[in-house]
Amino acid sequence: MATLFMKLVSFFLILSTFCLTTVNSEPQCHNFKSIISFGDSIADTGNLLALSDPTNLPKVAFLPYGETFFHHPTGRFSNGRLIIDFIAEFLGFPLVPPFYGSQNANFEKGVNFAVGGATALERSFLEERGIHFPYTNVSLAVQLSSFKESLPNLCVSPSDCRDMIENSLILMGEIGGNDYNYAFFVGKNIEEIKELVPLVIETISSAITELIGMGGKTFLVPGEFPLGCSVAYLSLYQTSNIEEYDPLTGCLKWLNKFSEYHDEQLQAELNRLQKLYPHVNIIYADYYNTLLRLAQEPAKFGFISRPLPACCALGGPFNFTLGRKRGTQVPECCDDPSKYVSWDGVHMTEAAYRLMAEGILKGPYAIPPFDWSCLSSEIKNTQNSLMNN
């Protein structure tokens, strides 16, 4: 153990010397070599499934999860591909494999540490405040530690690792949503939950700063979904007071304001980091508005006129029931998931994720926008057809 520890210490000391190299601060076209991903179920491509007790598997271990594209469960929290999958395809990469439990996986073009149920803050910190959750103990800090410990296996030398990190698109989430979800679901009031926001933002910022110190150059940092449009929250906070609902979307206005509160603070912190590290590209992914537009104009995007009910759940006005246990009760699903925005009441369908990814990659929901002008014509041709497949 001591020998391994000293090897890791030596590795990072050498790596840090390479990270002192001056980087051109001029904006450059984004031509990535790989994807490094952290986050929760929005980006999890199989990590929670790999970490789970075989006698108590999560719902993503079973159909109908994965039915649309893969035709079998993969550990993804959807009927098909996720935003991270569409990003990988857009860049001409294979789908990013999960890190945990992967045997003989090829991480040359990407590695994913995102885990379903993960939080930004440490589990012990949340539990001290009465916020309990059963799913995972893999916080953002744990994911980052796993990444650092894996570097000697992902690259052959400190200079090679620096090159890999510098030329990767680093996807920082979405992360933090579960910190709020768990707090809401145990009955914390809005003011108590607002107190978590600066702590979540600080945790995300610290992780970005640490990765910058390791050579990270381009970060895609998503904001929160509009919680007031979430089927889970619409079911939990259902009310007869029509004034609480947005008349256009049917979303709960006060919950969407909370999401906006988080996103405003996150963007302010990202702006601070960008000024502090002008040689780094920090891109904000506006998950809030790219998803909200699907509720505002569902027909425009091919969805049913009432887009909020879940495709695949267990009844109720929004086809969703809180508290369903792992692996229990196979839900009844809609005939055509491509017509629905919400998959299971918490996560989106592949159709919704495709449109969200397109809004981030092609605009206008990435701030600042990506510059893809230097990509090869082969990849550009793939991009032109990707979103229609």
Curated annotation (Swiss-Prot):
It is found in: Secreted. Disulfide bonds: none annotated. It holds the Pfam family Lipase_GDSL. It comes from the Eukaryota. One of its GO terms (molecular function) is hydrolase activity, acting on ester bonds. GO terms for biological process: lipid catabolic process. Its main location: secreted. GO terms for cellular component: extracellular region. Glycans are attached at residues 137, 319. Residues 1-25 form the signal peptide. Keywords: Glycoprotein, Hydrolase, Lipid degradation, Lipid metabolism, Secreted, Signal. Its EC number is 3.1.1.-. SUPFAM superfamilies: SGNH hydrolase (SSF52266). The active site is at residues 41, 344, 347. Belongs to the 'GDSL' lipolytic enzyme family. This is GDSL esterase/lipase At1g28570. It comes from Arabidopsis thaliana (Mouse-ear cress). The lineage of its organism: Eukaryota, Viridiplantae, Streptophyta, Embryophyta, Tracheophyta.
